[in-house]
């Protein structure tokens, strides 16, 4: 099996509880991976990393490439290798997509491992969200999203869906289950995905057997009580429910 590492910046629980300061820059992040997802300082948009480029989806759904100097409070990336390929045709919704991916990784005895999946193809519809940066610190992710989150839809779009899977026992380090971000092939639209309808696409699946977590290295990080974020709160901010 290929020995591959997930490089993660901070933890989802820290982000949910309001730690959205810069931990690393985009330039540093891309040294550790070419595919993944995350967000930017102050929760300033949704991050999509694919093919070695880092894109930021703003709260109107438009996308631009992030500069190397842009701050990153939370992200998870890996260096993709040639992994298992899975043909996807006529996927009506995100539940069916997650089910297909679950079956694929279960067949490889991987439900207790991390995975990164890159799906490229034609999407009939993508339901997504993003948000704008909130400058104050110690503001929970739930409150930031309540103030600045916008939802939008993309129809008949060719693009890339980046899917990150963490097993249930890693809850708090990251979101258990599947976390999906999208960017179109023309790099004009994207965001955090709530639902998707796939015409036809190809998924490439990488199993991850190692994690390297870069925690914030400043006194302010130790002022956060990271036991407070409940599973329900994490689910709400990740799934919009």
Where are these predicted regions, by residue range?
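A hydrophobic, small-residue-rich beta->alpha segment in the mid-to-C-terminal subdomain
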Residues: 184-227
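Compact, glycine/acidic-enriched structural inserts
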Residues: 78-89, 209-233, 238
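Short helix/loop capping segments that flank catalytic or ligand/cofactor-binding pockets
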Residues: 57-58, 127-128, 171-172, 190-192
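N-terminal low-complexity or amphipathic/hydrophobic leaders
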Residues: 11-77
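Histidine-centered divalent-metal-coordination microenvironment in nucleic-acid enzymes
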Residues: 175-183
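A glycine-rich, hydrophobic loop/mini-helix early in the fold
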Residues: 57-105
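Long, positively charged binding patches that form subdomain-scale interaction surfaces
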Residues: 99-164, 171-173
């Amino acid at each position: 099996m290929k020995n591959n590492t997930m490089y993660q910046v901070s933890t989802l629980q820290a982000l949910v509880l309001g730690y959205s300061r810069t931990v690393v820059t985009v330039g540093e992040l891309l040294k550790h991976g070419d595919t993944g997802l995350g967000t930017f300082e102050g929760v300033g948009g949704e991050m999509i990393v694919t093919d070695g480029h880092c894109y930021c989806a703003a709260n109107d759904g438009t996308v631009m490439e992030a500069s190397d100097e842009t701050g990153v409070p939370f992200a998870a990336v890996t260096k993709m290798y040639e992994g298992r390929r899975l043909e996807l045709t006529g996927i009506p919704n995100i539940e069916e997509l997650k089910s297909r991916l679950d079956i694929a990784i279960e067949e490889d005895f991987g439900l207790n491992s991390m995975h990164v999946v890159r799906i490229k193809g034609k999407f009939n519809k993508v339901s997504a969200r993003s948000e704008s940066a909130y400058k104050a610190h110690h503001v929970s992710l739930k409150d930031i999203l309540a103030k600045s989150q916008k939802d939008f839809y993309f129809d008949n779009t060719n693009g890339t869906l980046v899917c990150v899977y963490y097993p249930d026992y890693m809850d708090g380090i990251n979101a258990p289950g599947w976390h999906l971000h999208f960017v179109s092939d023309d790099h004009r639209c994207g965001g955090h995905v709530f639902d998707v309808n796939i015409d036809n696409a190809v998924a490439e699946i990488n199993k991850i057997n190692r994690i390297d977590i870069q925690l914030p290295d400043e006194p302010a990080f130790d002022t956060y009580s990271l036991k407070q974020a409940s599973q329900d709160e994490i689910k709400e901010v990740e799934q919009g429910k």
